[in-house]
């Protein structure tokens, strides 16, 4: 049996803030295997966001080996964010 998906402590706050500015947000946390945490639709664009808890030390915010591999093989853009501000910046100022 698969265990429950791990959700970062700041996910609810980030999701709420993104929805407040008009984004559509779908949690992908249950997918696992390194898949990013959120799929975000905003201003006719899609974003994949990997959430990290900005209150933890940098070493605890590192990508897991599964996340590193998922990001490596994905042929699209994935943004790692650790706060409401960085999540909003990621969708307002895409790379």
Model-identified regions with their sequence ranges:
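Catalytic phosphate/metal-binding cores of nucleic-acid and nucleotide-processing enzymes, i.e., regions
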Residues: 1-95
């Amino acid at each position: 049996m698969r265990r429950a998906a791990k959700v970062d402590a700041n996910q609810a706050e980030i999701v709420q803030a993104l929805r407040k500015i008009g984004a559509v947000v779908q949690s992908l946390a249950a997918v696992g295997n390194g898949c990013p945490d959120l799929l975000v639709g905003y201003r006719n664009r899609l974003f994949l966001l990997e959430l990290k808890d900005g209150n933890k030390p940098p070493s605890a915010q590192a990508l897991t080996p599964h996340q590193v591999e998922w990001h490596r093989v994905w042929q699209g853009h994935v943004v790692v964010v650790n706060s409401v501000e960085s999540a909003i910046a990621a969708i307002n100022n895409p790379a």
